[in-house]
Amino acid sequence: MGKHDGHVHTPFCPHGTKDSFDAYCERAISLGFTSLSFTEHAPLPKGFTDPTPAQDSSIGWNELDDYIHTLSSIKKAYRDQLTIYIGLEVDFIEGFEEEICTFLNEYGPLLDDSLLSVHFLKHSDRYFCIDYSPDVFAVAIRTFGSIQAVYDTYYRTLERSITSELGPYKPKRIGHMTLVNKFQKKFPAPSTEHQKKSQLEILQLVKKHGYSLDYNGAGFIKPLCGESYPPESIAKEAVALGIPLIYGSDAHQAKALATGWEQMTPTLKNQDE
């Protein structure tokens, strides 16, 4: 495969920008990419209330068919310059596995690519979007009881996302597996040793299920993170286990394509040796 970005958002994203599909594609071509996966946030399950203050986590149900139709046209328009994959970033939400499976059974056949990501953590009957803001993360810490409890819940939920039966169209690539680190400079994991153990256990599960990892550059431009998801040390462990790493910029605007590419290329190249 040539230069590929496997995690790109779109003008359909309510918390992104209105940069057009053409803007993303032209920028990708200028950067030397040969293929892109557009992976917009899939609609949240019916019955689940978006807990974010702006309630802007995902595309609406009423927009989904238009998204797929529009991308089908873009795919044809650029077919001689860029291979475009129609995809979605699907949220794993504890307690909504059945609804997610139903959604995937309906829309999975229409997709070329997909990611499975954890953004929401469950506590009793409440959910927290742990990458929304430092303020929301702080409320989660108070609710869960400690920073460690938030980190532990994140990795436990990630584990469930990997092991859950979500049907034949379940995404086989795990999105930004260390997203809980987004605000780590303000809320560092109390025990880096404990966190690394959790991360290595996740890698073993990914390996066991034959999945791949979204090697995500967005953390490099998050001021309280400053590293990829997962960080280089864990990415190298994944390579050693034979887990495929798929680069993803997680761009929410055209100019963010290739975020982290230069820093991450050595590890990406190692898996091809």
Curated annotation (Swiss-Prot):
**GO BP terms in the entry:** L-histidine biosynthetic process
The record ties this protein, via CDD domains, to: PHP_HisPPase_Hisj_like (cd12110)
Instruction: Give a single Pfam family match.
Output: PHP
Going by the record, the broad EC class of this enzyme is hydrolase
User: So what does this thing catalyse?
Assistant: L-histidinol phosphate + H2O = L-histidinol + phosphate
Tell me which EC number(s) this protein carries: 3.1.3.15
What does the record give as its pathway? Amino-acid biosynthesis; L-histidine biosynthesis; L-histidine from 5-phospho-alpha-D-ribose 1-diphosphate: step 8/9
**Name of the protein in question:** Histidinol-phosphatase
Q: What is the lineage of its organism?
A: Bacteria, Bacillati, Bacillota, Bacilli, Bacillales
